[in-house]
């Protein structure tokens, strides 16, 4: 199973990519349940380089690494691994930013759900979640 979501925003790919990656802590809905740390979650970061971390920082200063950046090509694509501690394997998230007239089309794929029964079961929830996350992003940009 591969989760696919797409949405369009009326901003340039350069602006959209920068806000998505460098300002993720301003728009990601941590306090709305989209966090591994729950109530402890304070901030979220993407380190802008291949091999960098996608991680949450908690109120006590500890961190949880969601995954590692596997592609970072401004303003076109960012990708990272994603692993819940209960899963059998990692998944991968890839986000592309394509020029679309005077705006940008954002295409997200989250793949690798076939690795185990726990992951297959949780895939639908993640599909719904990515829709909410992208809507939150577009409302903040």
What positions do the PLM features span?
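Hydrophobic ligand-binding cavity/cleft-lining segments
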Residues: 1-42
